[in-house]
């Protein structure tokens, strides 16, 4: 399907700025899609203005009430500047370095929860320290663990002990990370005690989880940095790894939360390099953005996806250091 954004008028946009057709079409897709959206435009194509316009329109049209834009740490100020360049009258909240940790972070998250912002721009590293509730984390982890246990059973049934061991090791690592982050969440709850009540007048809850922020739209800039999501599979080839980066598991939890609350179509990833090392990265992008579509097509499991859309080919390659094959 092709999306035509020529109908969009962008009320409130700065006079003298006209978005290109590809930017308008991307915004139209984000606003109309029933799944998450990957904006895989090349470097220099204007993904920042695309993201700003999409979030602002989603807020204006009522598709979202609390859009959040997650960007690399050094780009928060630039994103805020670009947002106000495109929408001079916008009411945005942008995270500074002082807001990134400790009491500064507690105050910032409380402002996010209490304010009516057109958009909130946050630093990547601070975003990944704000988790969904421990109860939800444990529930989501149980789902992923079940997928891995199924793959372990498959591997052991065909005598693939190597793949089975890798999957078991990854489950152990994920359980360790889960236990650590749950304990950290409990400590955070004590540390930010009172911040949310002061701004919300809510005397019942003494901590802030991601769910408390009211976020119902996520725009992830430089999304290729979240490609290392654990893959439950017995396929053992370069580029397909069962290991996961914790920040990727955390983002997946937040995407699952948005889907669970009916906002899965408000997940937007932007990157100029959607594939850098392996085609398996495309599978992970689809898991973040459109897992229901994968299930509907019968390719939710990586093995099914790989057999449907790819093939394993043996070839000779030069070593990265260039000294052999």
Predicted regions and their residues:
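Conserved pre-motif I regulatory segment
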Residues: 2-40, 226
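Catalytic acidic motif of RecA-like/P-loop NTPases
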Residues: 44, 125-126, 224-231, 274
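Conserved P-loop NTPase motor "coupling/switch" region that bridges the ATPase
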Residues: 85, 89-92, 96-98, 142-182, ...
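Conserved SF1/SF2 helicase motif Ia
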Residues: 38, 42-45, 50-81, 87-91, ...
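Conserved helicase motor
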Residues: 94-105, 123-129
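Coupling/switch/interface segments within P-loop NTPase motor domains and analogous charged loops
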Residues: 116, 120, 126-215, 219
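Loop/turn-to-beta-strand initiation segments
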Residues: 65-66, 116-119, 214-216, 263-268
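Conserved motor-coupling elements within RecA-like helicase/translocase cores
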Residues: 102-120
């Amino acid at each position: 399907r092709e999306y035509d954004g020529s109908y969009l008028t962008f009320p409130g946009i700065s006079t003298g700025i006209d978005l290109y057709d590809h930017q308008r079409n991307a915004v139209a897709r984000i606003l109309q899609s029933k799944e998450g959206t990957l904006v895989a435009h090349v470097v220099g194509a204007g993904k920042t203005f695309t993201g700003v316009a999409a979030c602002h329109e989603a807020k204006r049209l009522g598709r979202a009430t609390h859009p959040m834009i997650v960007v690399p740490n050094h780009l928060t100020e630039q994103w805020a500047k670009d947002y106000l360049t495109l929408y001079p009258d916008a009411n945005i909240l942008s995270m500074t370095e002082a807001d990134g940790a400790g009491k500064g972070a507690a105050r910032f998250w409380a402002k996010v929860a209490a304010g009516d912002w057109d958009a909130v721009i946050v630093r990547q590293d601070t975003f990944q320290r704000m988790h969904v509730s421990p109860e939800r984390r444990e529930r989501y982890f149980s789902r992923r663990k079940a997928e891995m246990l199924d793959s372990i059973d498959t591997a052991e049934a065909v005598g693939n002990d190597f793949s089975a061991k890798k999957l078991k090791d990854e489950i152990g690592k994920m359980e360790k990370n889960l236990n650590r982050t749950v304990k950290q969440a409990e400590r955070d709850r004590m540390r930010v005690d009172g911040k949310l009540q002061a701004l919300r007048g809510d005397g019942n809850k003494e901590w802030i989880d991601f769910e408390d922020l009211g976020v119902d739209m996520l725009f992830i800039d430089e999304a290729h940095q979240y490609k290392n999501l654990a893959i439950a599979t017995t396929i053992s080839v370069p580029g397909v790894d069962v290991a996961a980066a914790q920040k990727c598991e955390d983002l997946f939890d937040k995407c699952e939360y948005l889907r669970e609350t009916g906002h899965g179509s408000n997940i937007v990833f932007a990157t100029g390099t959607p594939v850098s090392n392996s085609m398996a990265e495309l599978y992970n992008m689809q898991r973040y953005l459109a897992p229901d579509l994968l299930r509907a097509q019968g390719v939710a499991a990586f093995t099914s996806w790989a057999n449907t859309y790819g093939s394993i080919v043996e070839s000779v390659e030069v070593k990265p250091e260039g000294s052999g094959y």
